[in-house]
Swiss-Prot record:
Belongs to the RNase T2 family. It comes from Debaryomyces hansenii (strain ATCC 36239 / CBS 767 / BCRC 21394 / JCM 1990 / NBRC 0083 / IGC 2968) (Yeast). The keyword Hydrolase applies. This is Ribonuclease T2-like. Glycans are attached at N78, N175. Keywords: Cytoplasm, Disulfide bond, Endonuclease, Glycoprotein, Hydrolase, Lyase, Nuclease, Signal, Vacuole. GO terms for cellular component: cytosol; extracellular region; fungal-type vacuole; vacuolar lumen. The active site is at H84, E143, H147. PANTHER family: RIBONUCLEASE T2 (PTHR11240:SF22).
Amino acid sequence: MLALILTISICIFLKGSTCSYINLGSEGIVFGAPNCPVDIPLTCTNSTPIDNSCCFESPGGILLSTQFWDYYPPIGGNESFTLHGLWPDNCDGTYEQFCDDSLNIRSATDIVLNQFGDKVLYGKMSEFWKNFNGNDESLWIHEFNKHATCVKTIRPTCYDNQRYVKNKNVYDFYNITMNLYEKLPTFQFLAAEGIVPSLTQKYSKKQINDALTKYFGKAVYFKCNKYKALQEVWYYHYLQGSLKEENFSPIDTIINSNCPEENIQFIPKNGFNPGPQPPKSPRKGYLESPGKKGCLISNGLWYEAGTCATYAISQQEFGGYKIRSSKGYCGMNSQGQFTCNKQVDPTKNQFQYNKDTRKIGYGGNFAWCLDTEHKHGDGKTAQTPIKISDGQCDSFPVQYGGK
């Protein structure tokens, strides 16, 4: 009877909702869902704090379904964008990453296929959730450890203790991510408006924007590579209730496309070969701030009196950049300070690097501040940690100066 009552209340709520899509479990309820109020607001729209973190996703209230079109080397089917992930971004566009090591996993296949026996889900993941290097499993693990550990509403504590089994949150994340991807067939959206892969035909930004907006209902972010070719598409959503309820509400993208206004390529898979490419070597240079005295030394601290350290910046396997000095890889410590030493794991510290401005960012934020409360020494010889700005300090950019 309880299940029936809960089912009815959810269905009534859905009929009055603006949500475009939702999946319910076979019993008519979402497994292990908490007793969430039916009138809980969409994420990022609340005027007062929501205490129940099992019913309201925060701070990652923007959910992005991200898809890639990898044409060289060709990844995935010729008529499908591949799934990259489901990301919880903060309402201001910044984001957390690798939030809880205790939730990390080492295998996705064991959980989806062996523990839960879901051959259908595993088959879909294998076909559409592809890694450019051929190791799909490593991408699935990375996406969970980096992003899903930051999703508060699918923490194990948000499940009914009597019905929760180990790794149910992992299985749910993969299943929900795939469900949302299947509702966003980017290739078909574009093809329906005459935008198809071609080595000769080129398209305008307006054509692509109008096509995606028509079928998603809101403005969509799309990204081009250095060849002015379409490569990524991101769909932004707010969420109502727990992620387990899959009550996504489309919203406009909060960032602008980098694609040119005209002559955008949509290159067929197997239809492009750039020729021999020189090996990529790490960029090397100083980390400093234009007009600001000082720079970063090898331990990651800001110093005014000495010689700047040389930092190497290179791309990570799954996106983002890793930074290294003579002391070791660099990352953000438990106090939120930039630090470099041999204990830092670069795979858990993905920085951003804007090639045009040469600015370094972390978690979507490119503003840094001096943590003067924890400086070492005084005067010109003081060594001061830097941290990502919280909006309450005198911020400055950290810029890479190539040698």
